[in-house]
């Protein structure tokens, strides 16, 4: 401390610059010499200083104040480092896992196969956050969403069995959806044909067993009031004079301009269709209308 004070005094304003530089070099050389003169027998672990035999407690230590300061700082640094050391015996050694640990038995990390194998199956929490600095050399498992590990070729199962079954079922369902062939034209045509014969098949299914002639006559005869077609009015001279009228309960065929239902609530649901409106109807209704017209005109003759 005296040397630093002398240097600060010699550097007062107005002093000689050459004299100041020479004195600074001399003091720096003396400090280096004093540091080299520290006894080799000094041990930092137990902080014991070998004193001379004729040195009593009241006498001064064989070190200057500057040397004592350096020694105390060194002791404090080593003491803090010893207190900050942790027990890493439960942490697997990543270098031993890779086969290049040079520490051997003095390695602070564990070389136990059980600890290393358990660490391999433990998912890395830093990889889940996206900031694992070890990469493929990490001791823990870098698990992908599909269940495989990036740093190993063996799969790891981290999901419950029920979830695995659900995922496998979802994958198989999606695979079958994408790999199923599209409907062919023949299939679509047969589907439309089945829709066209829907009412006739339902009628034949739930009707009692009758002869083909009776079924033909009953099917193509004008509907009665008890059937789904009510208030039927027919004119053989003109087919375009009739149009289908749909209601909430049944399909009604009636002549244009003629109101056949007396119930006001039913009349609100009636919708009159003219000749162009018939073209907008489905092919099934037009086909039924033409067949009914043909049979009623020629079969009874």
UniProtKB/Swiss-Prot annotation:
PROSITE patterns: ZF_C3H1 (PS50103). InterPro entries: MKRN-like (IPR045072), Znf-CCCH_4 (IPR041367), Znf_CCCH (IPR000571), Znf_CCCH_sf (IPR036855). Transmembrane segments: none annotated. The keyword Zinc-finger applies. One of its GO terms (molecular function) is zinc ion binding. Keywords: Metal-binding, Phosphoprotein, Repeat, Zinc, Zinc-finger. Residues 1-25 are annotated as: Disordered. Signal peptide: none annotated. Residues 7-25 have a biased composition (Polar residues). GO terms for biological process: protein polyubiquitination; protein ubiquitination. The modification Phosphoserine is found at residues 21, 30, 282. A zinc finger (C3H1-type) spans 87-114, 123-145. This is Zinc finger protein LEE1. It comes from Saccharomyces cerevisiae (strain ATCC 204508 / S288c) (Baker's yeast). The gene is LEE1.
